Each structure stands twice: as C-alpha cells, then as structure tokens.
C-alpha cells in the first residue's frame, strides 16, 4: 500500500532504513524475504543510501550479511556500545567486545565500505578511562560513521532491581566522556553532521553522529 501511494504521488525513493530495533534478529531466510519484498514493491534504482542496522553481534552471521549485501544494502550499523566486557555484562549484553570486532572484520571481507558504530557515554559502571579506551579502539577500526550516544534509560532497559539506575549518580564523567570523544574523533578527521536528544538523557546532553568526509548518513540528516 505504501509503495502504491508513493507511485501515485510521483515520489522517488532516496533512502531505505531498517532499524530502531534489530532487523538481524530474524533468520537469514526471513531477512531475504523482507529485502526481496522491498525490491519487488519499490523502485530502488534512484536510492542513494540503503541502511540496515545489524546492531548486536550475537544476531549477526556471515549468511545474514551476505543476504544484506546481495540486496544492495550500502550501509550497516554494528554497535559495540562499549569495548569493556564488564560493562557489557552489567547492562545485559551477552557478547564479549571481541565479537563486535569479528563481525566488523567479516563485514569488511564481504565488501561493506560504509559502516556505522554506536557507543554510549555514561553506561553504568563505565569509567572515563574505560570510555577513552572504547573511543581509541573505534579509531583503530576506522568505521565511516561513529555515533556517540549519551545514556538515556528506557522503560524496557534491564536496569531494574539490583541493577536499578539512579540517573543523578551517573552524571559524573559523562560530559568529559562526550568531550573526549568529540576531540579525538575530530582530530582523526571525523566531522559532526547530526545530533538529537532523547528523554531521560544524562546531563541534558545529546547524541551526535560523526562521519568521515562524504560519508554522512543521509537518512539521519533527512529526519
């Protein structure tokens, strides 16, 4: 129906974005059905950018990445959040940091040349030194896009009970974390190109997307 409305209105599709969740949580077969459906009903010939959030490494396989690649996807996200294994465990992630690196390298092997990686400043139990390590590890990997989020606790987050979070207790180093990320990314040729805020965000800060020159995430700009 959406495709038909777009055709009748004479609209041309410029960006495709699957995310705001984890599309790779479905099977490779389901993922292929999804991308085939998009290709069947929409004219992708004038699409400038096609993004899928691969997200968590525990949902990524070579088969799924190949399906995505074959569908013409030009940009993916592989999100470490942090490279500190202890912090990952505390916030409920079931993978080690190395798994992110492995998925990133696998994506490069398959030919992906536009990769975004998200990190979060202010995660519970994280420290300024640990966050600096995360930033430096990202710079070593060299993705085309890096998005620096500031922690915003959502209702569904597994930070209740023993992991209950007092937002006021997490604000200590978060501004320094964000400032460090900005300085180091810009020193290494990344440019800030979009930002947005969320509810319950620490220190009233924002989320900022950085990119290498000419690698802006177009969907992020348009919204």
Describe each model-derived feature in a short phrase.
Residues 156-223:
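A C-terminal junction/extension of Radical SAM enzymes
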Residues 1-181:
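Conserved non-cysteine loop/helix-boundary elements of the Radical SAM core domain that shape
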